[in-house]
C-alpha cells in the first residue's frame, strides 16, 4: 500500500445510524472492487457529525481503476443511491496520503 485515500465525511448528526448502515455496506463492496479497506470510523465522543474512512491502494492509478469498478458495481450503485436518497452526507473531502516508512 503506497497511497491511502482518507475520506472525511460531514454527516447529519441525526442520521448517524443510517450513515453507519451506509458505511457497513462498503465493508464488502470496497474490497471486491480492489480497495484495501483500513476502516470506516464513526463519531464516538466529541464532535458528532464527522466520520472517516481510509482505503489503501498501490498507486493513484490503482485508485482510479478502483473508482471505475466501483461506479459500475451493482451493490456500489445501490449504496451511492441510498446515501443520496437519505441525504446522509453533507460534505465529503478526500485527501491522499502516503505512509511514512523507515
Cite the ranges covered by each PLM segment.
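An amphipathic, aromatic/His-enriched active-site/gating alpha helix that lines ligand/cofactor pockets
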Residues: 21-38, 56-93
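Absolute protein N-terminus
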Residues: 1-2, 102
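Short acidic/glycine-enriched loop/turn segments that link adjacent beta-strands
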Residues: 46-49
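Short, structured motif recognition centered on aromatic/hydrophobic residues
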Residues: 3-8, 19, 30, 51-54
Amino acid at each position: 500500500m503506497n497511497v491511502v485515500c482518507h475520506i472525511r465525511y460531514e454527516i447529519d448528526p441525526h442520521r448517524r445510524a443510517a450513515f453507519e448502515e451506509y458505511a457497513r455496506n462498503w465493508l464488502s463492496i470496497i474490497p471486491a472492487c480492489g480497495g484495501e479497506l483500513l476502516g470506516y470510523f464513526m463519531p464516538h465522543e466529541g464532535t458528532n457529525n464527522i466520520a472517516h474512512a481510509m482505503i489503501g491502494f498501490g498507486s493513484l492509478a490503482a485508485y482510479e481503476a478502483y473508482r471505475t469498478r466501483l461506479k459500475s458495481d451493482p451493490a456500489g450503485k445501490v449504496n451511492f443511491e441510498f446515501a443520496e436518497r437519505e441525504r446522509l452526507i453533507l460534505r465529503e473531502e478526500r485527501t491522499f496520503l502516503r505512509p511514512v516508512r523507515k
